[in-house]
Amino acid sequence: MTRGLRALPLLLLAACSTAPVSFRAPARLVAQADDLVEQGQAQEASRVYERVLREYPTDPAAASALYGLGRLQASPASPLRSYRAAHATFSRLLSEYPQSRWEREARAWRAVLGDLLAREDESARLRAQIERLRRTDLDLERRR
């Protein structure tokens, strides 16, 4: 009986906590999404990250959700891999949450992805040029 009475003040104190459950929910959701990424459930993780961004845009966990989403999009092993989307996600993180704890990492990711995208664009341009030259060469061979 005395145990129950000792627990009562703790229960009352917890009920009067200044941090409502909704303020703890975003961090829990980000942790859940991170776990889903580790389990290889990229699609579901993406949905959870997006939920945090939609429902808690002003919570500090929103920056963590963007960071997790950007890493998911940048991962070569991810079925959601899109370097352009990842670059845009890290840019959004830097724009919307410039003082977040992820600022330095997001800046580094964005720089690396920007370089990668520039190289991919140049590679595509060169492949197209090679294809045009190949066709021109074939046309010249036929005319001989």
Residue ranges, per PLM feature:
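Short coil/turn linking the two alpha-helices of tandem helical-hairpin repeats
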Residues: A74-S78, A111-G114, A118
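Bacterial Sec signal peptide processing site at the extreme N-terminus
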Residues: A15-Q32
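Structural signature of alpha-solenoid helical repeat junctions
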Residues: R24-A25, L29, A61, S82, ...
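Short solvent-exposed coil/turn linkers within tandem alpha-helical repeat scaffolds
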Residues: E55-A62, L93-R107
